[in-house]
Amino acid sequence: MDKLRIAAYGGFRWIPPKAGAAGSDKFAFELYPRIVKRGHTLVAYCRIYPGDTDFQISEFEGITLKYYKTHSKAGLDTLVHSAQATFDVIFNNTADVVHLHSGANSIWVILLRMAGKKVVLSQFAMDWKREKWPWYGKLFYKVSNYITAYLPNKVAFDNVYTKEYFEKKFRRTYNFIPYGSEVKIPPSNIDILNKIGLQKDEYFLFVGRFIPDKGLHLLVEAFEKLKTDKKLVLIGGSPNPSEYEMKIKKTTDNRIIFPGYVYGDDTNILIQNAFSYIQPSLIEGLSPIILTVMALGTPLICSDIIENIFITKSNAIHFVSGDINSLNEKLRYALNNKEAILSKAKIGKTDVSERFNWENITDQYIDLLKK
């Protein structure tokens, strides 16, 4: 099988990413155009949420885009959408090989394999540990692990720790393929800084979803205790209406600002001009935003979970995960040791560019999809 016919769905919501997008969207945005450029065909199944009025394009950089309506409730949206995509693949024969995202979608492997489709599943993290899921959601993930472990033709993990967990529990061998770190160097204009009212090096930054896993409640409280004139800029929001987001935005500290969603070059410009980027995650897979921050050479403060340590090594400032006082201490350290954090960032930029290369990652995925 030289040229592949591939269908992809399950984790990403849209290609290209838009408001509410997450790491899986970035992953698909970087990987799939590269696969198509190597001569393969790929159908990506995107989501339409209630009230979504955006114009739906049918093609992006050679990728065929198909759309299905889904539910707005977190978790249920993936289930409903993936069911429709699965039946389209089977009954309309849109692909020979299916690339599924997330073990939550492993239930569809059964039908796909029965229909003669090859399935490669990408597992990004220990999702059953995420605080955003109720007990029944966590139970669903734990049960799905057994299907993930045995039924796909191949399974790829983006971090070695989840891979090791599965290998130890299920006594099987799996594949490790990380995210890439390359980013387009943003233009030198600072229009986005002017729009938000920022100056270079005068703000800390976070970009991502406002969900408990990301630890924003810890960051807000730690920053509120910090004596500085610098601002804390929290870019993003919740993919669905969220009490957690409302709680975060109740802060009375006027140094903390919420510009909403920002994408593309503007995001990278904000990262590149920040005094430091902060990633307070309680749980992660291999974090795309950390890779982006390090590739741009911006000083990084992040939680000491093993997935973050794997990427950053000693090239970031680490605080004890879940510990507000530890985070506050590291914020104070950064303010008083600018040259030290810049030195770490410079070394980290070189390191991630060598270890996390999108072209090599694309080659690995194509090899896996062909097996």
Functional labels for PLM-detected ranges:
Residues 26, 206, 211-225:
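A conserved mid-protein helix/loop that constitutes part of the nucleotide-sugar donor-binding site
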Residues 31, 87, 114, 138-155:
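Membrane-proximal helix-turn-helix segments that form the acceptor-binding/catalytic region
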Residues 47-50, 181, 207, 231-246, ...:
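Glycosyltransferase donor-sugar binding loop
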Residues 77-91, 95-124, 128:
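An aromatic- and histidine-rich active-site surface loop
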Residues 245-265:
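Nucleotide-activated donor-binding/catalytic signature segment of Leloir-type glycosyltransferases, i.e.
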Residues 282:
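Aromatic "clamp/platform" in nucleotide-sugar-dependent glycosyltransferases that forms part
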Residues 299-302:
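Short hydrophobic beta-strand element within catalytic cores of glycosyltransferases
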Residues 317-325, 333-339:
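Conserved acidic donor-binding segment of nucleotide-sugar-dependent glycosyltransferases
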